[in-house]
Amino acid sequence: MRNKIDYGIDLGTTNSAIARMENGVPTIKKSETLKDTIPSCVHFNKRQDILVGDTAFNVMKNDNTRALKTFESGKTNTFIEFKRTMGTTHNYECSNMSKNLTPEELSAEVLKKLKSFIQDENLYSIVITVPAKFLNPQNEATMKAAKLAGFKHVQLLQEPVAAATAYGLTAKNKD
């Protein structure tokens, strides 16, 4: 088993990003629109294509009905803020897919999109930062989403721990 972590992911409620260390410098991988982050937004069109990130967000913004799903019941095809329901039994009804989707499935689509920015075919392991307030069910749901996205080895790191670690590494280099 390999201990090296290849990439770090911020799977955010609003936006998400992927980065790795390159020559000792943390480097965020740019999206196809050359942005550091993508919206944590998923849309399913009538052809059942899955749109993620900026494309999905733009569809949502331009949608005349402005049908978006957070916690209300009803059918929609664009989903945002599903991270808030990770680790619960909440499902999202998607009219174009004629099925219910879990927060883990929607999060997996965001993770797959981030994974697509990576040229490394041997991508093996990742660290995903999670909020400090996440409990075991939410952590397990995040792990499930990563597995659904095809990541083989996943570690979770609480956001304050990640910040302290980064500060410690920076401070250590200045001493």
Go through each PLM region and give its residues.
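Short glycine-aspartate micro-motif
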Residues: 4-11, 127
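A short acidic Gly-Thr/Ser loop motif
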Residues: 9-15, 175
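Short, glycine/acidic-enriched loop or turn micro-motifs at the edges of active sites
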Residues: 13, 132-134, 162
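Classical protein tyrosine phosphatase
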Residues: 17-19
